[in-house]
Amino acid sequence: MTLNERIAELRERVRQQRPLIHHITNFVVMNDTANVTLHIGGLPVMAHDRAEVAEMVTAAGALVLNVGTLSPDWIEAMLIAGRRANELGIPIVLDPVGAGATSLRTASNRRLLEELQIAVVRGNSGEIGALAGMGGVVKGVETVVEVDDPTAAAKALAQQYRTVVAVTGRQDVVTDGKRVFLVDNGHEWLKTLTGTGCSATTVIAAFAAVEREYPFAAAAALACFGLAAELAAPAARGPASFKVAFYDAIYHLSADQIRAGARVTAVAG
């Protein structure tokens, strides 16, 4: 089976199994990430109260922790849900939104990485560079200075916390500290919408819920996400029409389209 055939098969598994994805995520993207979860084939739940997260996560296939609109109560809820997910072997996908922009964000993300076993960290170059201690400058939640070598930063962070790191950008990099996947799918229109990185994190979680080879799951998810953007682009007249076409493309993404269009390369570590 070729790599693209494996990606297509994994995408169909998500559709068939319909994993519940528990999100503790930010206010900006809740609606969008819930819809993307549905369109890729999963079931979303947005539950962040400390009183219920440990119970809610028991039914989940994966847990998304997104610190975009963080607060002390939400960080505590993330830790409660994360500890329970670790007990049950449920994968956690961390989106370290704005790491490096403020000391609170950087410290909160490091606390989550230190106290929980995270399956996948998905961030932009600046966020991953900041957490790895290798530079990168984040203004708000956007990278304004990229790290010189995103692959090296991703490997360093993956090795430090025994996790998988996915750096999204012009070329996506996924690594567990040894193996590396490069993903070349995507489109410039993605930059015109807020929350596309958070939505990519959601797709990674849906794939990780049904595939425990997390480096491959993350790379496959990013390939499908980027390919959907490519397929949507010809219908776009602006950001709003692109968003509608993009959601439709995620929903309709077929095995034939993936086999023909996914651009993922496995490289030596």
Swiss-Prot record:
- Give me the residues that bind substrate, please: M46, G195
Q: Which SUPFAM superfamilies match?
A: Ribokinase-like (SSF53613)
Give cofactor(s), names only. Answer: Mg(2+)
The protein's matches in InterPro entries, at most eight in alphabetical order, are given as: Hyethyz_kinase, Ribokinase-like
* Source species, domain of life: Bacteria
**A biological process from GO:** thiamine diphosphate biosynthetic process
A GO molecular-function descriptor: ATP binding
**Xref: Pfam families:** HK (PF02110)
Keyword Membrane on this protein? no
Q: What is its EC number?
A: 2.7.1.50
Kinase in keyword set: yes
Keywords of this entry = ATP-binding, Kinase, Magnesium, Metal-binding, Nucleotide-binding, Thiamine biosynthesis, Transferase
**Its annotated pathway?**
Cofactor biosynthesis; thiamine diphosphate biosynthesis; 4-methyl-5-(2-phosphoethyl)-thiazole from 5-(2-hydroxyethyl)-4-methylthiazole: step 1/1
What is the catalytic activity of this protein? 5-(2-hydroxyethyl)-4-methylthiazole + ATP = 4-methyl-5-(2-phosphooxyethyl)-thiazole + ADP + H(+)
Q: Which residues bind ATP?
A: R122, T168
Describe the task this protein carries out: Catalyzes the phosphorylation of the hydroxyl group of 4-methyl-5-beta-hydroxyethylthiazole (THZ).
Q: Which family does it belong to?
A: Belongs to the Thz kinase family.
Q: What is this protein called?
A: Hydroxyethylthiazole kinase
What gene name is listed for this protein?
thiM
